[in-house]
């Protein structure tokens, strides 16, 4: 009968070993999750660095290519100025739109911070942990006296068994039974209580996310719109005419600028000699070839510029896709954080309800224990006094009566011992259950606190990375926009200078043609007014009018 309590006392050891094994497995799983989160954070950092480097390289390459192409462009017309003004207005609108988008995102981030601040009731969690610690201390104070009482009951049972064995060994000495009940001293040396094991709570390191980030760059470099008829004044004729017809039409058009006092020859009369006419035709062909080469060069430059624009647009699309992926990852992480917080809150509510139930159960057991102690003390005192009176009144006078008395005493002791063992076993089982429930509750609270701490650290890291990414994106956008505006300003200045030079050149060429035609008309009028052939020859022997320099020299 004494071996049963010892076996029951050894039962919590395998349970504690199983609990340690489960805690070690849970700790290893948490470490694996931490390692995975750290690896994911490293990959996110690498992806962000690669995206930033590729973006900077792409922007630098596009800027270099645009500068090289813009430096080599020629023959820009006046109509491009209005188109670039509209493009600048569109860029300003895009900048305003980007500023509005950034303000909306900042408002969303502030709302998210408010939600996170509401979802982290740190003060209430600390109060609940302190309350749980106080409840565990109260349970320990209740369990220790119960264990002491159980130890005292065990000692009493052992003394009763020893007394019965002594009575069995000495059946022939009836006087030795007198006052046998006085040999039952009560031992008040309680056995040392078993302290509940404390479970370590592991702290997990911070984890990331990534990245994410929001980069709405717009890199659109417009192609130059080159018109054909406005820049080549007095150098080209209407389409569909031969070079000879173009030269004739140009001379006819300049004839309108001749003063009315000059005599006009009849139609069909040859105004220019054949050599000069051929020379003018050769010059016209050369100018036309140069114009065609300039057009081809312009088309090639436009194609190269369009290709560079397409490449830049593709690179910007790739960067935008990466930013969207990082934002999606951030949103998923925020969703998981919110779900984990809701789950933690539900588990805390369940633990609070279970804690209340356990406290009520402990109170009930305490009341039962007090009632049992109150019942046992009067019954034992009454039984002892009755036995003393019976033994004093009627002592056995024969061996048979002595045997009957011993048998009756043994049955009473056995029944009392069984009742006490059953009661002690029931109390021990309830104590073990309460201790296990308390340990589970403590472990659950520790794990929930660790998860909450990890989620809070991950949220802080993600918020910091999001802020840094947004700041970097805004800086890159401002630098890119500033570079675009600087390039556009330099292009507009260069275009204005080229257009001014072309306008002056075209006006000078027109004036030279007018002077040349006037000089030819004057020479022809002199020949027509000559009286003799010698005068005509002298006029023809003068310096030929092949260039405007001949007019200035003459």
Swiss-Prot record:
Subunit annotation: Heterodimer with RABGEF1. The dimer binds RAB5A that has been activated by GTP-binding. Interacts with SDCCAG8; this interaction is important for ciliogenesis regulation. Interacts with RAB4A; this interaction may mediate VEGFR2 cell surface expression.
Protein name, UniProt field: Rab GTPase-binding effector protein 2
Keyword field: Cell projection, Cilium biogenesis/degradation, Coiled coil, Cytoplasm, Cytoskeleton, Endocytosis, Endosome, Phosphoprotein, Protein transport, Transport
Disordered, as annotated region: 1-29, 167-250, 375-395
Record GO terms (molecular function): growth factor activity; GTPase activator activity
Ribosomal protein listed as a keyword: no
UniProt keyword Kinase present: no
GO BP terms in the entry: cell projection organization; endocytosis; protein transport; regulation of cilium assembly
Gene Ontology cellular component terms for the protein in this record: centrosome; ciliary basal body; early endosome; intracellular membrane-bounded organelle
Matches recorded under Gene3D superfamilies: 1.20.5.340, Single helix bin (1.20.5.730)
Assigned protein family: Belongs to the rabaptin family.
Lineage: Eukaryota, Metazoa, Chordata, Craniata, Vertebrata
Modification type Phosphoserine: residues: 176, 180, 187, 191
Skewed-composition ranges (Polar residues): 377-386
Main location: cytoplasm
Role of this protein: Plays a role in membrane trafficking and in homotypic early endosome fusion. Participates in arteriogenesis by regulating vascular endothelial growth factor receptor 2/VEGFR2 cell surface expression and endosomal trafficking. By interacting with SDCCAG8, localizes to centrosomes and plays a critical role in ciliogenesis.
Amino acid composition bias (Low complexity), ranges on this chain: 1-15
Coiled coil residues, start to end: 15-173, 274-512
Compartment(s) of residence: Cytoplasm; Early endosome; Cytoplasm, Cytoskeleton, Microtubule organizing center, Centrosome; Cytoplasm, Cytoskeleton, Cilium basal body
InterPro entries: Rabaptin, Rabaptin_coiled-coil, Rabaptin_Rab5-bd_dom
Regions of compositional bias (Basic and acidic residues) in chain numbering: 16-29
